[in-house]
Amino acid sequence: MTELKQSIQPIGIFFNAQYPSLEAICQRWGLVFDKEAAFELVFENNCLVLNKRDEPKLKGISVDFVSGAVAHRRKFGGGRGQSIAKAVGLKQGVNPSVVDGTAGLGRDAFVLASLGCNVTMVERNPVVAALLEDGLRRAYESEEIGDWMRERMRLVHGSSLESVAELGEEIDVVYLDPMYPHREKSALVKKEMRVFQSLVGADLDADGLLAPATALATKRVVVKRPDYAEDLDGVKPSMVISTKKNRFDVYVKAAMKA
């Protein structure tokens, strides 16, 4: 399910140390107890949840691949006609292997896996990686989606795409969705995203992702950007697939073949 590729600098987090399962998760991901930490990890209904301690009215953040919005998108989101599917090159007889180099909460990775891609998620923030692993655990146990989730979706915890390159596997597509500062005032930004951004910060080194992504991918690199953002690292893409608020910049290296 999860491969730990390298140690990460410990991050402080608040949790109830009387719960062995929480303590074990924090030890596994290099999270150290900090009573002054802004964030807290808790278990709610067999689900690992991240809460922002100074905003108790905000809903906690968790990863749920089985129900909720991502499940609705899997069932009713348009299948392979979705822009993200076109961007990675999904078509009849072609199910690319994909590395999501900026996994976040795993939603785009899940869409691609549900459409037939084998997806390896890379997440360098250990708190987010812990949430992802918990989401995968519950998805793997699901009667509805468990079988194909175990086959198509996994997590690698590491600080860079080199973590995947070390595995020595051939990767068709590298998918990147770097955190980009919102243009709107903070009150207009979705609350969950605001909390998430305050945890992980902006990807200030995002431009440095394109070169290793291009080296790793054998077929193409796909970069998801807000419609107002500049090209990643100033490099013009081979083609652009636009949606209402975002676009997918596609850097083609070789044709997809069935």
From Swiss-Prot:
Compartments reported by the entry: Cytoplasm
Keywords from the UniProt entry: Cytoplasm, Methyltransferase, rRNA processing, S-adenosyl-L-methionine, Transferase
SUPFAM superfamilies the UniProt entry points to: S-adenosyl-L-methionine-dependent methyltransferases
Catalytic reaction list: guanosine(1516) in 16S rRNA + S-adenosyl-L-methionine = N(2)-methylguanosine(1516) in 16S rRNA + S-adenosyl-L-homocysteine + H(+)
First-tier enzyme category under EC: transferase
EC numbers: 2.1.1.242
InterPro entries: 16SrRNA_methylTrfase_J, SAM-dependent_MTases_sf
GO cellular component, one term: cytoplasm
GO MF term list: rRNA (guanine-N2-)-methyltransferase activity
Binding sites annotated in the UniProt record for S-adenosyl-L-methionine: 107-108, 123-124, 159-160, 177
Main location: cytoplasm
Domain of life: Bacteria
Family: Belongs to the methyltransferase superfamily. RsmJ family.
Function: Specifically methylates the guanosine in position 1516 of 16S rRNA.
Name of the molecule in the record: Ribosomal RNA small subunit methyltransferase J
Organism annotation: Shewanella sediminis (strain HAW-EB3)
Gene giving rise to this polypeptide: rsmJ
